[in-house]
Each structure stands twice: as C-alpha cells, then as structure tokens.
Amino acid sequence: MPVEVKLYTRADCHLCAEAKATIETVAEEVDTPVTIAEVDVDTDETLRAEYGERVPYVFVDGWPAFKYEVDAEELRRQLQDA
C-alpha cells in the first residue's frame, strides 16, 4: 500500500515549491510506493485558520513530519520505515 505524503501549501510560496520538489525527488528514489497529495490551505477557511502562514506543512503516513523545510534524508527514512 502506498505511503501518503500530504503537503499543505499555498500559491506563491517559495518554501512550498522547494518542499514539493524535495518530496517528488525522494519519492522517485525510494522503493516504497508513495502518493503525494497537495492541499492549498487558502481554498478552505478551516485550513487557512489552522495553518495560517505556517506552510509548507507536511504529513507522512498521517503523522506531522515537517514544517517549512523538508529534510530529504529524514523523509527518505520515514518513507522506508512506513
């Protein structure tokens, strides 16, 4: 079963673009199947209130994993351990 990586983001967020690029690169490198779900917090009032400016925020397999920056080595470890 694939591991879900959920990326909470918003438009015009350079850190979000960097996080997405790191996630996509690592997902291609690991043997574990990965699905990536990108959620724009500005499309939902509840999410906008919850995350505010605190994006990117990344969940791996349902657990909070990264805020602002994604560490490629740590993400790789989390995906392999999931």
What are these regions (language model features)?
Residues Y51:
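Surface-exposed interaction regions that form or flank ligand-binding interfaces
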Residues T32-E45:
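Thiol-based oxidoreductase modules, predominantly thioredoxin-like and allied folds used
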